[in-house]
Amino acid sequence: MFDEVKKSIQWGQETLTLETGKVARQADGSVIATLGETSVMANVTFAKEPKPGQDFFPLTVHYQEKYYAAGKIPGGFFKREARPSEKETLTARLIDRPIRPLFVPGFKHEVLVMCTVLSHDLVNDPDIVAMIAASAALTISGVPFMGPIAAARVGFADGEYVLNPEVQDMDHLRLNPEQRLDLVVAGTRDAVMMVESEAYELTEAEMLGAVKFGHEAMQPVIDLIIDLAEAAAKEPFEFASPDYSALYARVKSLGEADMRAAYAIHDKGERRDAIEVAKAKVLAGLSEEELLDPNLGSALKKLESGILRGGIIDGRPRIDGRDNKTVRPIDCEVGFLPRTHGSSLFTRGETQALVVTTLGTGDDEQIIDALHGNSRSNFLLHYNFPPYSVGEVGRVGSPGRREIGHGKLAWRALQAVLPAPTDFPYTIRVVSEITESNGSSSMASVCGGSLSMMDAGVPLKAPVAGVAMGLILEEDGRWAVLTDILGDEDHLGDMDFKVAGTENGITSLQMDIKVAGITPEIMEQALAQAKDGRLHILGEMSKALSEGRREFSAHAPRIETMTIPTDKIREVIGSGGKVIREIVETSGAKVDISDDGTIKIASANADSIKKAYDMIYSIVAEPEEGKIYVGKVVKLVDFGAFVNFFGKRDGLVHVSQIAGKRLNHPNEVLKEGQEVKVKLLGFDDRGKVRLGMKMVDQETGEEIAPEKKEETAEG
């Protein structure tokens, strides 16, 4: 019934298995990849005809983590998987980015890749497994895909690279000082196609070494996919890249002169308008048949690409007049908004980010519901890219994959320099509003985010800056690395290489390569050039603010932290939360109690914090023998007075300890409700508190000297 094929290898510490032919047999390609006990099913389908007039490649990648994979039931009212989580969105991008450039040029049929996590052992992250499964499914599907690719995760601990570290080692990397790197690399047998990483001030050499280590480690996986394809691949889909050389020649003859003139304009807006005029002139000169050719868009792009790339390779200035290593002019401003906790406006050329930091309490932490368990994050970074930032009219709604991906990249770059939660017990939310964009807006978010947090008083270990690098690589082997690329250079170039870090090292690296042939020499040059650019930007940022402010904004909350014995937590909370509610209502402060006995008291008002602190302290602290306390008489009896002191504690002042003279009854000198000063004398055999008054001056609260007590008794 089934024509099943299964291939396995030992990969690192686990067995990697690829199997096909048993499940989802109506898909063009279906593979279940299993690493350890983590299994991901990848299914590929593609249209056998392109849609008429379609001039782009419609590739869609979906990745979904099924809760049953980890033996869990989804939360929420409907109890089923709903919209993609941030992790699912980011993993879909990880799969998409290395495979998209590997489809045969000119292939514009719709392709759908669906990856579903079927089992998760809570040890091996399913993202790497999904990338391998997707590559294998594409390779056996018959679609014109120039793969396969493979992927690997690389860690760095004790000076050694680690292949595919466990989930728990990578989770909350900031709190794991032994692990300094989380890097995902994907590539073919000969070339690296994609890198995504989070690092802790690693050197350029260490980062490059990690990329090489990951690329070498994935080679057995590529061999395994080829082995599977030899046994199970379908017949290749007949497709030849279209020959539009005649159309390109017509487009070039009609528009080259005007297009070159347009690309000589330095201002983005004027250049864009001139390009549109040049395109309109080309279209006006084409025949009706040529206008309907689905390769017209490709011909126009080839013309633009040749003009932009050829000038750079020949050593001429870039389209905005810069050389290959110069960063655009930078302007930094902090304290830009009056009522926010921290803000900055970072402008680099025609790219601008307004970045705002808000400080919150433990109640504001993000709760993350993942397959491997729930967790909380006290650092959030949100990136918004509205249409007006590029002068366009477009859809406005919830953040898309691109915004989530760019926000996560900036998050990775900045979180490496955050203080430990124990040293800075605030929740930090950074929002980057891209107000102008002409390339590298995610790196502008990094720079603006660093300034904004320092403006809010966050004690960063060091400022962070980021820069986007580009590459022009010609077929004849000539190449040029570009610093601080423009949007057009990103669109028409061969590499997008984003590097962020401090003066001491790299905190985040993201690389997307559109062509094969990127050598270690090119990557070394890109990293070296990126370091120079990063240090220059840090220097410009330091002119606005070089370290975190000593004082918070008047509108930001203050947080006081105290630790109590865990057996006292019940007393602070009280029956049904009665005590903690009273503390919050009386003081006006927010109080957050952790299971380990850590209490965070937050308020914008210092008096509120002190009041809540004192109320909690009076509940949990133990009175000390020999100390003097202020109390209130709550009951008088023949043998003495019961006094409430030190919060809710009661003690007995024996009638002989009330005054320096003999009393027949305490009511001779005391009345209920009277405030008195008492000294804790000790505890009786049953643990009852013994108090004294006669040795304390009731006016000053000071202890009376022995000779003075004798004089008082004689008088």
UniProtKB/Swiss-Prot annotation:
PROSITE patterns per UniProt: KH_TYPE_1, S1
Catalytic activity: RNA(n+1) + phosphate = RNA(n) + a ribonucleoside 5'-diphosphate
BP term (GO), one: RNA processing
Keywords, alphabetical: Cytoplasm, Magnesium, Metal-binding, Nucleotidyltransferase, RNA-binding, Transferase
Domain KH: 557-616
Name of the top EC class for this enzyme: transferase
Predominant subcellular localization, coarse grouping: cytoplasm
Residues binding Mg(2+), per UniProt: D490, D496
One GO MF term attached to the UniProt entry: magnesium ion binding
Needed cofactors: Mg(2+)
EC number(s) on file: 2.7.7.8
Domain annotation S1 motif: ranges: 626-694
Subcellular location: Cytoplasm
Record carries keyword Magnesium: yes
CDD domains cross-referenced by the UniProt entry: KH-I_PNPase, RNase_PH_PNPase_1, RNase_PH_PNPase_2, S1_PNPase
Source domain of life: Bacteria
GO CC terms: cytosol
PANTHER family: POLYRIBONUCLEOTIDE NUCLEOTIDYLTRANSFERASE, POLYRIBONUCLEOTIDE NUCLEOTIDYLTRANSFERASE 1, MITOCHONDRIAL
Function text: Involved in mRNA degradation. Catalyzes the phosphorolysis of single-stranded polyribonucleotides processively in the 3'- to 5'-direction.
Family, similarity comment: Belongs to the polyribonucleotide nucleotidyltransferase family.
Protein name (database record): Polyribonucleotide nucleotidyltransferase
Organism: Paracoccus denitrificans (strain Pd 1222)
Gene: pnp
